[in-house]
Design a protein with these regions (language model features):
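Intrinsic disorder at enzyme termini
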Residues: 1-8
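Glycine-rich flavin
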Residues: 21-124
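Conserved S/T- and glycine-rich ATP-binding loop of Class I adenylate-forming
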Residues: 9, 20
Length: 124
């Protein structure tokens, strides 16, 4: 059994690693952490690359890729200590995709995919 990443997955990993290393040098991460903020310009840049919608179906504005590609991005974001709303958005999107009604998916997943909407998972 072969567990190597595909060429496309390796390209996603390489691109993410390079971009995040450039964007989130340790001084910048500290500055953002001390201010209790995230880098909105970096978030918009990742949105333009389609990262928030990597797992969302193309019919709803996403890239229609899979969980492996999503996890590759999460791993690189974690490695870079990137203070961004990516994880919460992805979690909300995954829950909506798995358990949401068609109406909920159509209402929220395009915004999550574009980065216009920000979500999180809550339990009562």
């Amino acid at each position: 059994m072969n567990f190597d990443f595909s060429d496309d997955q390796q390209a996603i990993k390489r691109t993410a690693k390079e971009l995040l290393a450039e964007r989130f040098k340790m001084e910048r991460v500290r500055e953002l952490a001390e201010a209790g903020k995230y880098d909105d310009a970096a978030w918009r840049e990742l949105c333009e690359l389609g990262w928030p919608g990597i797992f969302v179906g193309e019919d709803l504005g996403g890239q229609g890729l899979g969980t492996v590609e999503l996890i590759i991005l999460m791993e690189e974001l974690g490695y870079a200590l990137a203070p961004l709303p990516f994880l919460s958005n992805a979690a909300a999107g995954l829950v909506l995709d798995a358990a949401g009604s068609d109406e909920q998916k159509e209402r929220w997943l395009p915004g999550i995919a574009s980065g216009e909407a920000r979500g999180t998972v809550g339990m009562l």
